[in-house]
């Protein structure tokens, strides 16, 4: 697929520290966070003017789903806009708490595990054609996704019976199946529930739930960009070596526990390969594919360059090559500097605190944003683009229609209902427009509906 629709959903961890007598449960904190949303949207599940969806997920986790984007860079801008929107709700909730005499600070973490060992996710969505064989797509993708953490993990200090260790991925410990239609009960690598949010005869939505949530824009670029290239190869029928894993679930944990990428995992055919070798195989094929197909645009070149440098860095152990660009390395080096300075063991509570503070989305407190302010991390988006994306939808996808419809309906104080495919005015006529094509950003039916308000 030359032009693909992408979407990211991030669930955020909520916590609150209190200095007074009154303590609030995560549920109550989440209600404070969403009070402003509920006051104008009459629900804790709303679509916004930028085409995105914001809602309170199971277990009081706020979740932000980006609008449909047709470029990886735009996807990153909109994912970051989601962080900024939630940061705004955070400030609001703290102000409300203080007005009610409750002394406390609310924290939102863009990570994947809390201190109680619960996991919440970052789900990636890729639109794929209906014609291909979905099971083949999944088979070829699983070895890629199991080892992909090496290039885009968020890193985690994991407590084990033998002491604390630094792992590459946060999500790896919480994945229990390869392919499944459930997301919460059994966490698979690829979720097969068939909800394309588009013309079901033409499209399917590939729902990848194995990835970590990323703070780094460049890590996000590599995560989604490399996956898109692998998908394009599979769609084009490129022959790839059979790297089916004997036990993907065991492999995903083994890969996460090995920062060198050298440890061998068993393949279904009895051979053994390291995570690094598996990634190098996909990378080489993707680079040759991009070359042959004339796909070497600036954006693709940047993805391939970062992919290659990351594999070189892991292979040689020279992590400085990617110390400004890949989350798990940025965080690892931050922790190592701190440990050396304070003579701390990996298991020290202050190290665990640092691990968590990296993911704090508050730009005044979060460690990732402290590094960003100091110019210590690379960017792909600008602050202005992110600010605009808080209220302006992508202009080249269906999100534009949804965003314009919501904006007009709110301005005219009209009662309306929207989801990913429907736009409905709740008046006598109950007029509804069904938008099945996610690539269409212009539709006279929607324009008619908007101008009738």
From Swiss-Prot:
Its EC number is 6.3.1.19. One of its GO terms (molecular function) is ligase activity, forming carbon-nitrogen bonds. Pathway: Protein degradation; proteasomal Pup-dependent pathway; Protein modification; protein pupylation. Mg(2+) binds at residues 9, 55, 63. It is an enzyme of class 6 (ligase). The keyword ATP-binding applies. Keywords: ATP-binding, Ligase, Magnesium, Metal-binding, Nucleotide-binding, Ubl conjugation pathway. The keyword Signal does not apply. It catalyses: ATP + [prokaryotic ubiquitin-like protein]-L-glutamate + [protein]-L-lysine = ADP + phosphate + N(6)-([prokaryotic ubiquitin-like protein]-gamma-L-glutamyl)-[protein]-L-lysine. ATP binds at residues 53, 66, 420. The active site is at residue 57. GO terms for biological process: modification-dependent protein catabolic process; proteasomal protein catabolic process; protein pupylation. Catalyzes the covalent attachment of the prokaryotic ubiquitin-like protein modifier Pup to the proteasomal substrate proteins, thereby targeting them for proteasomal degradation. This tagging system is termed pupylation. The ligation reaction involves the side-chain carboxylate of the C-terminal glutamate of Pup and the side-chain amino group of a substrate lysine. The reaction mechanism probably proceeds via the activation of Pup by phosphorylation of its C-terminal glutamate, which is then subject to nucleophilic attack by the substrate lysine, resulting in an isopeptide bond and the release of phosphate as a good leaving group. Belongs to the Pup ligase/Pup deamidase family. Pup-conjugating enzyme subfamily. This is Pup--protein ligase. It comes from Catenulispora acidiphila (strain DSM 44928 / JCM 14897 / NBRC 102108 / NRRL B-24433 / ID139908). The lineage of its organism: Bacteria, Bacillati, Actinomycetota, Actinomycetes, Catenulisporales. The gene is pafA.
């Amino acid at each position: 697929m030359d032009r693909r629709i992408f979407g990211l959903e991030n669930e955020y961890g909520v916590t609150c520290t209190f200095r007074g007598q009154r303590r609030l449960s995560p549920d109550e904190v989440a209600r404070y966070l969403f009070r402003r949303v509920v006051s104008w949207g009459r629900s804790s599940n709303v679509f916004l003017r930028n085409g995105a969806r914001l809602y309170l997920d199971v277990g009081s986790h706020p979740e932000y789903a980006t609008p449909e984007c047709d470029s990886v860079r735009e996807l990153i801008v909109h994912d970051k806009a989601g962080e900024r929107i939630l940061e705004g709700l955070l400030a609001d909730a703290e102000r409300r708490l203080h007005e009610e005499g409750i002394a406390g600070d609310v924290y939102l973490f863009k990570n994947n595990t809390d201190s109680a060992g619960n996991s919440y996710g970052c789900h990636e969505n890729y639109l794929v054609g209906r014609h291909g064989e979905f099971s083949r797509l999944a088979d070829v993708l699983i070895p890629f996704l199991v080892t992909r953490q090496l290039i885009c993990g968020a890193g985690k200090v994991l407590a084990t019976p033998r002491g604390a260790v630094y792992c590459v991925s946060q999500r790896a410990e919480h994945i229990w199946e390869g392919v499944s239609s459930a997301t919460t009960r059994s966490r698979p690598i690829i979720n097969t529930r068939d909800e394309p949010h588009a013309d079901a005869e033409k499209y399917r939505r590939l729902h990848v739930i194995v990835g970590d949530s990323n703070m780094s824009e460049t890590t996000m670029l590599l995560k989604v960009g490399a996956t898109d290239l692998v998908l394009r190869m599979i769609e084009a029928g490129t022959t790839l070596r059979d790297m089916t894993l004997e036990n993907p679930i065991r492999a995903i944990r083994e890969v996460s526990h090995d920062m060198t990428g050298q440890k061998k995992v068993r393949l279904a055919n009895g051979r053994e390969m390291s995570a690094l070798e598996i990634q190098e195989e996909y990378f080489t094929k993707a680079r040759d594919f991009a070359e042959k197909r004339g796909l070497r645009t600036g954006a693709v070149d940047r993805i391939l360059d970062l992919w290659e440098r990351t594999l070189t860095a892991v292979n040689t152990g020279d992590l400085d090559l990617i110390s400004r660009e890949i989350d798990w390395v940025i965080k690892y080096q931050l922790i190592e500097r701190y440990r050396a300075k304070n003579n701390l063991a990996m298991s020290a509570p202050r190290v665990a605190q640092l691990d968590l503070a990296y993911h704090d989305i508050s730009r005044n407190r979060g460690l990732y944003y402290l590094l960003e302010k100091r110019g210590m991390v690379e960017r792909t988006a600008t602050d202005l683009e992110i600010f605009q994306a808080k209220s302006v939808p992508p202009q080249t996808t269906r999100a534009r229609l949804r965003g314009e419809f919501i904006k007009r309906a709110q301005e005219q104080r009209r009662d309306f209902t929207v989801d990913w495919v429907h736009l409905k005015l709740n008046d006598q006529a109950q007029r509804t427009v069904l938008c099945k094509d996610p690539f269409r950003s212009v539709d006279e039916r929607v324009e008619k509906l908007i101008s009738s308000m």
